[in-house]
């Protein structure tokens, strides 16, 4: 891992601030065109919104209902490209809409056919109406009282943090330089008042430095306005943050390989119950919040809402005692042009991406969704390169394979590598670690599939710098079972200490920091 940016006092074509899906996507796109790219992330890659999604690569049925055909078509195309470029992480999944009223089958069936039609050659499967028996075959734990049947359609599912880490590796392979735990403390300007670089601080060492670039891209998501204010103190806010939470349960709450999709909840959102890494993931909510934080906390009313709504559809109504983990994320929704203050309905805010260029030349890319990160990046790099008068070069990411790509089908990879299959082609190298030292094949916890070799791999090759990085984003232990993650933490700290050279004081500090974060993922009775 390369931590010393000071040793490379070069002028960059582009500096990207923010290491989530959007920022890393921009770094991949720009580097693949041949531009010199530096990306700086104040915390870990995906620490914010990008690791806290509903884990869906989808077009968005709700946007279709709202009449946003353009967004749906764009997302369906990008969904198809995601599956093509990262089949080791993205896969198709059957979603069932249970029908309890006579009108639901024809109504939703028609909408799903349109959704399928809009996907064109990027379609994932054929939607159809299901009988009552077929619906229960898909969803054995669905409540049967009043059930008439259902409708099934196919969308994409993925592991968001795992995909992001492989995108980071892809950006490196294309020639970009990316650093986590480097905070941008300010923007620098030339004699004409145009942004020409950043000042930054290495969080680990405290070292400060300046980096110069022809253009700076603000890809800080929910925190976009904070960086914009450094460029233009009078800048009007663009972002209206909204919080969504998810609850995680044992797989027994949703037996089988299909997901439930509830098209209308009482807060106007869609609710999903999804099989994910051997567990059941249920969410989400849409709660306006005053300001974004790196570690948002689920509100009681959100927790109760999901428990109550899930209980309306599942034969065994989940309770607080059943929750293995609860996590919250912040959506960086974009305020409508000309609206600068006042209460705004989150349902009315834009889910489209926006690229804004301040008078000082700071390029801000925000909004959008995980599925469309590649298209957002293409659009952003096009505009940033034009602004900076960089040599015109076409986007090449449409068919650029993400790191870890291999041709094996999901089922074949799972047979060969088991839980290591999520690492794609890296699974071969992780298996070599185990072959060299059998002890590295030992599981870290009986309730989760992770082994010691994955910790070593994360520290050596995936820029994991903290216990939290490993347990939250290199593995998904914290998101799947918070108590199990807490139990694993000492062993993870020991392994990372040996790899990263921590002394006992650092190890102790790391464990304390992780326990503080993990406390918000544990739901108490």
What are these regions (language model features)?
Residues 1-14, 29-33:
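Extreme N-terminal leader/targeting segments of oxidoreductases
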Residues 5-7, 11, 43, 89, ...:
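C-terminal accessory subdomains/tails of enzymes that are appended
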Residues 10-12, 205-215:
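Core beta-strand elements of the Rossmann-like FAD/NAD(P) dinucleotide-binding domain
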Residues 16-17, 211-221:
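Short hydrophobic core segments
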Residues 18-20, 42:
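Glycine-rich Rossmann-fold phosphate-binding loop(s) that bind the pyrophosphate
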Residues 31-52:
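Glycine-rich FAD pyrophosphate-binding loop
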Residues 55-138, 271:
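Dinucleotide-binding Rossmann-like beta1-alpha1 core, especially the glycine-rich loop
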Residues 180-196:
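A conserved short coil-to-beta-strand element within the FAD-binding core of flavoproteins
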């Amino acid at each position: 891992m390369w931590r010393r940016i000071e040793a490379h006092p070069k002028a960059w074509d582009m500096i990207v601030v923010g290491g989530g899906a959007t920022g890393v996507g921009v770094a991949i796109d720009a580097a693949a065109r041949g531009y010199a790219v530096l990306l700086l992330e104040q915390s870990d890659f995906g620490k914010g919104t990008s690791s806290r999604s509903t884990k869906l690569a989808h077009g968005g049925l709700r946007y279709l209902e709202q009449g946003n055909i353009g967004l749906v078509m764009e997302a369906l195309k990008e969904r198809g490209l995601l599956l093509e470029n990262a089949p080791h992480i993205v896969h198709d999944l059957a979603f069932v809409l249970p029908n309890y009223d006579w009108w639901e089958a024809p109504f939703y069936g028609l909408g799903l056919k349109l959704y399928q039609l809009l996907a064109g050659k990027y379609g994932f499967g054929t939607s159809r109406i299901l009988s009552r028996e077929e619906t229960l075959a898909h969803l054995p734990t669905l409540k049967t009282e009043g059930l008439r049947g259902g409708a099934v359609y196919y969308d994409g599912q993925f592991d968001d943090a795992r995909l992001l880490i492989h995108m980071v590796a892809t950006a490196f392979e294309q020639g970009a330089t990316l650093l986590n735990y480097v905070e941008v403390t300010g923007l620098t300007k030339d004699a004409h008042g145009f942004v020409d670089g950043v000042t930054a601080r290495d969080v680990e060492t405290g070292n400060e430095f300046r980096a110069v670039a022809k253009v700076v891209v603000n890809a800080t998501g929910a925190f976009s306005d904070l960086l914009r204010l450094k460029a233009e103190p009078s800048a009007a806010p663009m972002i209206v943050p909204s919080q969504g939470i998810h609850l995680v349960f044992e797989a027994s709450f949703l037996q089988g390989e299909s997901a439930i999709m509830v098209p209308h909840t009482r807060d106007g959102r869609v609710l999903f119950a999804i099989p994910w890494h051997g567990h059941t993931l249920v969410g989400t909510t849409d709660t306006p919040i005053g300001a974004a934080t790196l570690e948002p906390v689920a509100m009681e009313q959100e927790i109760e809402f999901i428990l109550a709504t899930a209980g309306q559809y599942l034969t065994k109504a989940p309770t607080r005692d059943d929750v293995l983990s609860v996590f919250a994320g912040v959506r960086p929704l974009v305020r409508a042009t000309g609206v600068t203050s006042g209460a705004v309905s989150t349902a009315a805010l834009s889910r489209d991406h926006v690229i804004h260029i301040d008078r000082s030349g700071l390029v801000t890319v925000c909004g959008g969704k995980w599925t469309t990160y590649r298209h957002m990046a293409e659009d952003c790099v096009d505009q940033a390169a034009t602004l900076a008068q960089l040599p015109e070069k076409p986007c090449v990411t449409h068919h650029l394979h993400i790191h870890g790509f291999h041709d094996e089908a999901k089922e074949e990879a799972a047979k060969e590598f088991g839980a290591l299959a999520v690492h794609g082609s890296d699974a071969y190298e992780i298996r070599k670690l185990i072959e060299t030292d059998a002890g590295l094949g030992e599981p870290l916890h009986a309730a989760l599939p992770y082994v010691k070799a994955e910790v070593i791999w994360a520290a050596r090759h995936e820029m994991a710098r903290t216990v939290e990085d490993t347990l939250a984003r290199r593995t998904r232990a914290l998101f799947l079972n918070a108590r199990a993650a807490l139990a694993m933490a000492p062993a993870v700290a020991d392994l990372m200490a040996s790899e990263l050279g921590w002394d006992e004081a650092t190890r102790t500090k790391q464990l304390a920091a992780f326990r503080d974060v993990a406390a918000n993922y544990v739901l108490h009775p």
